[in-house]
Each structure stands twice: as C-alpha cells, then as structure tokens.
C-alpha cells in the first residue's frame, strides 16, 4: 500500500460517515479498519525512526505531513488506540506546539482538530485564532485567505486548505457566520475554476 493514498481514502471514508451521520456499510467499515491498521503500522515505523534519531542526538521539532494527516484521521474518526500506538500518539502530541509558528493553514487546521478532540480547547483555540488572523473578508468573495493568489509559497492548495479550515472552525464551535462567509468563496471558486481533478472535487 501507499501511505499517502491510503490516508486520502481513509479521510474520505471518515468524513463520509460524519457527513451522513450514519454507520458505513459493513464491507466499507472493514476496509476502513484495515486502512487504519496499515496507517498505525506506518506511523509506528516513523515513530521508531524518530526515537532512534533522538537517541543519536538529532533534535526533532516537527512532524511529517503524513504523520499530521494520520493524527488528524485518528482524531476525526475517534479511533481508540492502545499499547504502543497510544504511547506513540501521546509522543506525537508533544510535537504539535511548533505548528503554531511554522505550520501551513492545513497543518494548523489539522492541529486544532487534533487538540480539540483531545479536550485541549485552550491550545486548540490558539490555532483557531492564528488561522483567523490570515482570513480577509469582502462582500463579493466572502471570507478567504489573502495569499490564495500565490498559495504554493505557503505549501498549500487553496481549496483543500480552505475546506480544512472550515472543518476546524466548525469543530471549535461559535463560528457559524464565518463559515457561511467561507462557503461563499468556495462557491465563487466553483463558478470560476474547472475542478477537473478528482482530488479537488472530493475535497
């Protein structure tokens, strides 16, 4: 399997059950469980490599995009971890603080959701506040990121970043009006941009 592709598909399955508020059909639920088994093992490999590097004196301050995606999926899917997986996840949690300064919008949104699901609301709200600092609002375009004109310098794709932030704001609560404004920007993108990749459409 491929960690990125498996993570992407798992994300769709997790969101699907959340959006429909229904349990997944049995065969799909089995597929999701197998996907998490694979992602757990891949994350564990990375965790062991990090711990080994630290023992050898390397300072690890941030996590890979794949590990951030994994933590986000575990949080969003309310996956229960035990044993070494739980220990690994707790360790990863200690590395999230640096994302406040260095993280892309997707990374900050994911971190906010992870912390929210861990009951660490105060820390999650710091990330939400940081995200809001970058949002601009106009009557015509709604709420959006000013740097969308040149997003790749920010290491992000505009639509997935926008959607990830909406998800984080929804999870934090009390942002309904802002989310509606962000929907307006998305609708404008749909009108002016051809979403010809399945990834953009799915997001």
Stretch-by-stretch model annotation:
Residues 1-203:
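Large, well-folded core regions of big proteins
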């Amino acid at each position: 399997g491929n960690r990125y592709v498996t993570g992407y598909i798992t994300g769709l399955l997790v969101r699907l059950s959340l959006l429909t508020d229904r349990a997944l059909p049995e065969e799909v639920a089995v597929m999701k469980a197998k996907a998490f088994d694979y992602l757990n093992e891949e994350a564990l490999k990375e965790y062991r490599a990090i711990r080994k590097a630290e023992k050898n004196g390397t300072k690890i301050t941030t996590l890979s995009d794949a590990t951030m995606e994994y933590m986000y999926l575990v949080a969003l899917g309310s996956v229960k971890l035990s044993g070494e997986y739980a220990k690994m996840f707790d360790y990863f949690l200690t590395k999230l603080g640096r994302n406040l300064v260095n993280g892309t919008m997707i990374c900050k949104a994911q971190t906010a959701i992870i912390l929210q699901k861990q009951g660490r609301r105060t820390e999650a709200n710091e990330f939400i506040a940081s995200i809001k600092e970058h949002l601009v609002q106009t009557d015509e375009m709604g709420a959006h990121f000013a740097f969308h004109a040149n997003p790749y310098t920010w290491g992000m794709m505009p639509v997935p970043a926008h959607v990830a932030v909406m998800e984080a704001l929804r999870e934090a609560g009390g942002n309904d009006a802002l989310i509606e404004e962000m929907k307006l920007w998305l609708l404008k993108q749909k009108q002016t941009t051809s979403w010809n990749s399945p990834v953009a459409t799915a997001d």
